[in-house]
């Protein structure tokens, strides 16, 4: 297994790059978001997910950060999602957007590129459970929002706390953290 590769980008294609690591060119499939950051000749470090397909061919999937890799791993555990479909989701949505779509039960965010209504519903349902079981520091939002960390430390459910905070932020966009926590506590205790 390969954990990560650091090398020079030699070639860029529609869904993958060729990464030169020690004079060996690796074909690494990446999301469109990663492709946008790639320039030929640049040095890059990618976290790697290795997959052996039906034809016994090894395929490498690269990610700029571990969070995107974790979301890929979660997506491929869902029945009906393969690596190609997961990469198309990650090309369309950032991990933060996936998290947001899941906690707000926004099935439409996942539709398109071969994903119909049933599969989109399965994605939101199954990821809600998986996201709620992730360690707090991996939920992405915690880094930006101390109010969520405070509510979780008080024993509130991560998804319910997130939804309450999002609602308060939309109603009171200029509220500081203390006000958000106070209003969220009121909302969650109803």
Swiss-Prot record:
Q: What Gene Ontology cellular component terms go with this record? A: cytoplasm; Holliday junction helicase complex; Holliday junction resolvase complex
Q: Its principal location? A: cytoplasm
**What ranges does the record give for the region Flexible linker, renumbered to this chain?**
143
Q: Region Domain I: what ranges?
A: 1-64
Where do the coiled-coil regions begin and end? Answer: none
What's the short name of a Pfam family annotated to this entry? HHH_5
Q: From the Swiss-Prot or TrEMBL record, what is one GO molecular function term? A: ATP binding
User: Where is the segment annotated Domain II?
Assistant: 65-142
Cellular location(s): Cytoplasm
The alphabetical list of record keywords is: Cytoplasm, DNA damage, DNA recombination, DNA repair, DNA-binding
This protein's assembly is summarised as: Homotetramer. Forms an RuvA(8)-RuvB(12)-Holliday junction (HJ) complex. HJ DNA is sandwiched between 2 RuvA tetramers; dsDNA enters through RuvA and exits via RuvB. An RuvB hexamer assembles on each DNA strand where it exits the tetramer. Each RuvB hexamer is contacted by two RuvA subunits (via domain III) on 2 adjacent RuvB subunits; this complex drives branch migration. In the full resolvosome a probable DNA-RuvA(4)-RuvB(12)-RuvC(2) complex forms which resolves the HJ.
Entry function: The RuvA-RuvB-RuvC complex processes Holliday junction (HJ) DNA during genetic recombination and DNA repair, while the RuvA-RuvB complex plays an important role in the rescue of blocked DNA replication forks via replication fork reversal (RFR). RuvA specifically binds to HJ cruciform DNA, conferring on it an open structure. The RuvB hexamer acts as an ATP-dependent pump, pulling dsDNA into and through the RuvAB complex. HJ branch migration allows RuvC to scan DNA until it finds its consensus sequence, where it cleaves and resolves the cruciform DNA.
UniProt free text on domains: Has three domains with a flexible linker between the domains II and III and assumes an 'L' shape. Domain III is highly mobile and contacts RuvB.
Name of the featured protein: Holliday junction branch migration complex subunit RuvA
Name the species this protein comes from: Ehrlichia canis (strain Jake)
């Amino acid at each position: 297994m390969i954990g990560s590769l650091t090398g020079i980008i030699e070639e860029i294609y529609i869904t993958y790059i060729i990464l030169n690591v020690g004079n060996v060119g690796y074909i690494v499939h990446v999301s469109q978001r990663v492709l946008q950051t790639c320039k030929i000749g640049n040095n890059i470090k990618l976290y790697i997910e290795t997959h052996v397909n039906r034809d016994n061919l090894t395929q490498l999937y690269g990610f700029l950060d571990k969070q995107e890799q974790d979301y890929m791993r979660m997506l491929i555990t869902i029945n009906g999602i393969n690596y190609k479909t997961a990469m198309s989701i990650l090309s369309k949505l950032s991990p933060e957007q996936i998290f947001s779509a899941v906690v707000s039960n926004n099935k439409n965010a996942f539709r398109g590129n071969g994903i119909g209504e049933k599969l989109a519903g399965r994605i939101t349902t199954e990821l809600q459970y998986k996201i709620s079981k992730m360690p707090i520091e991996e939920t992405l939002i915690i880094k930006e929002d101390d109010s969520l960390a405070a509510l979780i430390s008080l024993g509130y459910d991560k998804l319910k706390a997130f939804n309450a905070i999002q609602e308060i932020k939309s109603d009171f966009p200029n509220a500081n953290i203390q006000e958000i926590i106070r209003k969220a506590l009121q909302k969650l205790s109803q």
